[in-house]
Amino acid sequence: MPERINKLQPNRTLHLRGFDNLGAAAALHSATADSFEVSGVFRDPADFAVLILHDMDNFYEHPRLKHLPDSDFDGLTLTFDVRFEGLMTLDSPKFPTIDWPYLDVIRDDATSSTAQIPLSAPGRFIQVGGTQTAATATFTIVNNGLQQFDRLVLWYLNFNFDYLVEQPVECLYGFVGAGAGTVHRITVAGVDYTHTESLADTNTSIALALIAALGTSPQVTATQDTGAANQIIIRAALDDHAPVTVSSSSSATAFTLYGIGAGTVAASLATRINALDWVGLGVLMPLTATSTGATLTIASQKTGVDGNMLTVYAVPKNSRLTTTAPQVTLSGAVSDAIWRVTLDFAALGVPKIRQMWFTYAPALANSARLTSTEWRAIYSNFALTGPDAKQQLLVAGLDSVRVEQNDVWCTYSGIWADELGFFSSGYARRANAIGAKVTVHYACATTHDLYLGTSIYSDRANANIRLDGDTSTVLNCHLASLTAVNTRRRVRTGVPAGEHIVTIEVATPGFFYFDFLEAVVATSVPDPPPARLDLSPALDYSTDHTYKLSPARLMWNFDRLGFAGPMNEYIGVFWWNQRQRIGATIPAVTVTFAGTYVPGDAVFVNIGGQAIGKSVFPNESNALIARHFAYYINATYVGVWAAAVGGTLVIESRSPMPAYAFTFNAFAETVAGSTGSVTTVGALNTGVPGTWQVDPAQSPALNRGAQDWHRDFYTECHLRSRPIVTACSMELVNPPMEFVARFPDGAPVITSVGFGSLNSAHCSFAAPMRNYQKAVYLSIANLMAEVGLVPQLQLGEFLWWFFSNQTSSGGGMAYYDDETQALALAALGRPLHTFVQPTDDPAINAGADAVFLRNRLRDHAAAIIAHVQATHPAAKFELLFPYDVNHPTPAGVFHLGGALNRFINLPAEWETKPGSGFDTLKMEALDFGAWSRNLDLAKMAIRLPLDLGWPKASVRYLVPVFRPYSAWEQEYLLAVGEGIPFINLWAFDHVCLYGLRLQTPNQSPRAQASD
């Protein structure tokens, strides 16, 4: 049945844009029609990942499945629920160093204008589940006999909440005997407390008697003055801040005392905190406070874990009024909510969308360096509402007609040049002169829309389009973009069935690309072609068409394209590894506060142009000033963190990446009598990013993103009963140097991977690499077994490096890592012979040196197989053997191979299945098929295992399709003709990008020709 797909459908249209740095990893997985998950690991605060929700110019699918460009979101609304783990939360008020709080949009308009839509804005963001709490902390106020003018100051950022005991809380009266019968009196709130003097009384006894009398007063306490025995200290007893009048017969002076205790102080401080105009002052994380007795509870007004970064500290004048702790850090906040987000695209000002995406960033480490953090973003109830016709994405149906740039139906005038690239069939034609023209004849049996396949970019020319001589229209191919986009644009609608002529003429300066013309009969996704049980494209996890897609979308592609044969995945050389950073320098500055600061001084720290300060109050030490800035920085900044020890403050950039480089300055503004000073050492703009090196110590060997993706991928395979073999090779990007193979001059084997500036290293068969590969293969086997698969693993191109650096002085073949040389010396009784090139004679020294090397390869593979099968006895292993670089004599356009390569890279035990340790042998000869285009050589590769005695049922073949116009269909037919049961195409991305034919090819007389 045809299948309808929709915009923003998680298992059909979403994909990763990618993630930043080799230390990071991300995966889109567990996708259904209304849910999905993105997960991974971040190891640096500068790491981020991007999920593309919509791209009107679909890069991924084969033309049979690739949806037509559609930017219309007018009248559509997206609603979803989401929960984050280990990420910056959507509701965090922190400054966004990357766009994690937003939906980013590029509009489909003339200027490709952009929009940033806050996801947590009121009205579109509500909590529907989970837990979301605020951080709190408590101060206990201590009254150790506080006196008038005692002081307690709480500091948060540079806000002080200052409590001064302004009213008297006690008074003193002295009593002197005046003769028997004299009535001595103290009056409290109108109540007299008396003692009638006797003949036996002394001044002291009179005072003690009055103290005893006052013991019944609820409003005051009375104690004997330790300095004068006849004096009474009277203190307000209630902690209610209420006045009480006290007078005495011994003095004409009356006092009004106030009931000030720890509770009064706590309540007053709470009032001060709550009275601050937090909003007007623009405070990022405002506070609120309550008091119960002597306990002052301070809470973040905002919920979420950012509150756990806040510290409030206390500065008492003396020990009479203080707190049990000198500072409190708020804690207990939880950010584990499920948020519902609603996005009405038209109301948000984005009715036409070319691209939109979410960004993920690591949660901010609290007052510390970020450690490796695994993370998840879990989406559910992901639903688009609005008119059905606008929700649906259409494809060019089976009645559509595509005319390629090199078809006979195209006539060119002017200067045009072919350009190789990710175009339909692998080529497009380019012109850069006004007036260059292509005329295309085509016929379509159905009413259709007309699309032009082209390339849009910032330097592209416009073209005038005419259909059957109608009025010319302009196709604008300019796009403000960092990279060119190969896509299609609609140039006519509702074209009637029949034959037509289209002229396309370059109209403005710049480059114009003609890829194809397509008469599109728009439909839902068509039924798949007949399933091909012997064939499937191979996957390379390193490529966009694998790691950026969810397994659900990937397997849907295979299903709808009719690829039902056993699958082959190469895990690649970089995205899956656990890594550690080496050679990095994280910038830091040390600030020392010295001398003696006095009230009225002000101290400032300026980081990246953002200044924070400290107003100096009484009793504030240099250590306290340092702590103040540490608390302030850790509560506020996202680019740095700080720690204080004594009077020294250390501020460190959170990352050595350029985005985290900041200017820095610290200074003091002092008043008369101050000797305070500030000195700084270091800088915050001297970071060295270092290298993200493979870390063999981490377990499991696959990072979180690769684990989650493969677990889901293997689940999808298991649901289809689809065999899958996963391969590793001897190449890694940034491995530990003890892994790397060496030429005789000690130079490492380094080769380009074709992705940016990354290079991979070919590794040796040394113990460190072997132990690492044991862990890797076991991790993969565990994931397969976890979902119910029998593990099937491939040793992909397990070879000694097949090229020489003989052009270098002391160069040769890459057999000379330290371990191999040491073991050769022990085994041969002499140094290993220096082999110079692949064509060297392996029989030198009676073949002892070459046999030693060959057996090292054999034993390396056997050790890995034994290690995995100790845990998974039923695990199956496949060898992928590249015959082009191991041909016994140089062959093909690049003259690959040689006797030495052939001898050492295919151990004698592997030439037949019994005793090889392998269940299947897969042959490849990428050069012979894709570059040399020599079917005779390809046939030799196909036949090699058969000629050696391997049973056909255990042989597989890998056909290269990565070069346009190679004779891949004929190579496939050769393999079928030899009885090879299962064939893979290298690789899936090229099948889609070039739009390769899906039908089973027919045998033709050209099958033996080098097409």
Placement of each model-derived feature along the sequence:
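Short beta-strands within extracellular/lumenal beta-sheet-rich domains
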Residues: 35-72, 337-340, 424-445, 460-462, ...
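Extra-cytoplasmic beta-strand recognition segments
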Residues: 59-97, 341-362, 382, 446-450
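Extracellular ligand-binding interfaces
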Residues: 86-130, 339, 387, 454-475
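Extracellular carbohydrate recognition and processing domains
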Residues: 111-129, 336-347, 471-498, 507-509, ...
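Extended, beta-strand-rich, solvent-exposed assembly scaffolds of outer structural proteins
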Residues: 124-131, 138-336, 450, 586-670, ...
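Glycan-recognition surfaces in beta-rich domains, encompassing non-catalytic CBMs
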Residues: 392-526
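Glycoside hydrolase catalytic-domain groove-lining segments
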Residues: 551-559, 564-566, 570-575, 727, ...
